[in-house]
Amino acid sequence: MDERQVERLSGHGVAEIFPGGAEALTRRLADAETARMPLRVKLGIDPTRPDLHLGHTVVLRKLREFQDLGHTAILLIGGFTAQIGDPTGKSEARPRLSAAEVEEYAETYLDQARLILNFDTLEVRNNTEWLSGLDLAAIIKLLASTSVAQMLAKEDFGQRYEAGTAIYLHEFLYPLMQGYDSVALDADIELGGTDQRFNLLMGRNLQELFGKKPQLALTVPLLVGLDGVKKMSKSLDNYVGVTEDPLTMYSKLEKTPDALVETYFELLTDLSVSALSANPRERQKRLALAVTGWLHSPEQALRAQEAAAAMVTGSGGTGADLEAVPEFSLTEIAFPVRLANLLKAAGLCPTVSEGMRQIKNGAVRLNQERITDPNCGFAEAAELTGAVLQVGKKHFRRLVPS
């Protein structure tokens, strides 16, 4: 294998490889090449929400790197473990999801993962295959492999114990079940975010318990969201969804905080930061263009860039620019309608009250005209047909009659 490929695999966008670091991974790769046996590289995802965002793509991109080098990429859907709920990063127990919810979310995850992974060679599995059939004796064997003290060494559990917050016994099963997945799949390497270190080590421990060669673990950094502070999350509204329209995606990424731009380039693109312009604004634009072009197409990214510039400068843009603006059909609302209600219906604000707040703050424009009256309303669709509705500098809708 090419030395540069190995260096990229073990270094680019990688937080830690354990045990043994990059040397251990290099040995595994060399042994696999000598034996002409591809490595089995596992990535488990619990479908606990219906959509993927850029934070999820960091580890998916790393899985694709292994896949492109001829190794067996395994995308494991946590159909069973998602019903338990991963306690990682949580100060209290997660609400439990139903099997129907998990199945619905899993379908969406797989559809969106096609944007990153090659499904022609991907092995897709679901841990309900083996976990739903475990009998009590097998579960006791898993529980007996780990002490309560070891579980409390997991930061989240330890903090909750010290705070007197309830820790439920089914939560202890989560890392054990995730670890058993590696046994069932004969994983050689498991990928995950840095917050998954405890769970990845559990996979090694259980593989040894069951007489198998323990996997290597490779972690990737957690992507900080657009607020520049916390991990990217839809609930914190600091995210970029992988299926967002090109204009929204471009507009969000063009506002990436300066301190995050280099990190985003490393984790979300194949571009070298050293070859980029030193101008911070030009870097932001290049980042937005690269990521939007990757998840949509270079042509759509360019149209989004032109449309975003037209919307922000107030030039109105050309017909081609307007075509890049996502549409909202006015047939989906009843007239007369208040502007705040329209903002919610069009997906520009999560709630009517947030729409009112944005109007009062002067963030709402209709065809570049700022509207600050929270009681603003419209009697009929004809008043809005063809108009561009805008909230801030990132969110746009073109209002169409049908």
UniProtKB/Swiss-Prot annotation:
Chain span(s) of sequence motif 'KMSKS' region: 231-235
Catalytic activity: tRNA(Tyr) + L-tyrosine + ATP = L-tyrosyl-tRNA(Tyr) + AMP + diphosphate + H(+)
Motif ('HIGH' region): 47-56
Catalytic activity, EC: 6.1.1.1
Start and end residues of each S4 RNA-binding domain: 337-401
HAMAP family tied to this protein: Tyr_tRNA_synth_type2
Name of the protein in its database record: Tyrosine--tRNA ligase
Protein species of origin: Gloeobacter violaceus (strain ATCC 29082 / PCC 7421)
Taxonomic lineage: Bacteria, Bacillati, Cyanobacteriota, Cyanophyceae, Gloeobacterales
Gene giving rise to this polypeptide: tyrS
